[in-house]
Amino acid sequence: MSTKTARASAARSSVGSSGSRRIRSTPDERRVTILDAAREVMVERGSDAARVTDVAERAGVSHGLVHYYFPTKDDLVAATMRHAAGVGVERLRARVAARTSGMDKLDTLLQLAVPGGAAASDAWVLWVDAWSAGLRDQTVRHVHEELDNAWAGTLVEIIDSGVAAGEFTCPDPQQTATVLTSLIDGLALRLVLRRRGVTRAEILRILRETAAGQLGHTPPS
């Protein structure tokens, strides 16, 4: 059987009898189904321990179909991290766009950045895994940098618009964004690791006070 024929056969594969979800019909939907399953497996086991077989079983598809879309495990890991974090970036931008004032936009970003609930915690577990995997895998490192820059870029845009509107005073929005994103990373990591005495409310208070000090604005009560 030729490689082309084998790939076509894999793409037509139906849901496995042991699969936990029903495969979607279009190629793009099949790809998303696999990525969603990979995200779940990677959150539970870590990217190093996750196997393609585990992902195929979780997605309810054949092993061959996973390889049809993602030839190597490294391809799958990088694509999963880009997909999961990309959804978060899109959600962030939509929520921020719905706010009017600069401080409301900033507070929306801070609340979305700090884990709250199972879904947000899972996203951070995957993000921390990406930090670790990026030390060894250049592709994952580039994906991580790309998505980190997207978050930081949104923050810079918020600060710039606030300065233009006269809400903020900030001589260097890029530097302020670096300070705030670094603080978010460190504090959110402590929350994900369930460090004693660290709460989401306390982290948000620290972030709001720091942001207000950096931007010459009184933090919300």
Positions of the model-derived regions?
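Short coil/turn segments at alpha/beta junctions that flank glycine-rich nucleotide-binding fingerprints
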Residues: E44-D48, R99, A120, A165
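Hydrophobic/aromatic-rich alpha-helical bundle segments in the mid-to-C-terminal region
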Residues: T139-E145, N149, V163-A211, T218-S221
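Amphipathic alpha-helical segments used for helix-helix packing
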Residues: K105, A118-H142
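Helix-turn-helix
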Residues: T33, V41-D75, A79
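Hydrophobic alpha-helical connector segments
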Residues: A79, E90-A123, T176-L180, L204
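N-terminal intrinsically disordered/low-complexity leader segments
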Residues: M1-E29, P219-S221
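Generic hydrophobic, amphipathic alpha-helix propensity
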Residues: R30-A38, V55, T80-A84, G88, ...
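Small-residue (primarily alanine) positions within well-ordered alpha-helices
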Residues: A37-A38, A59, G162, A177
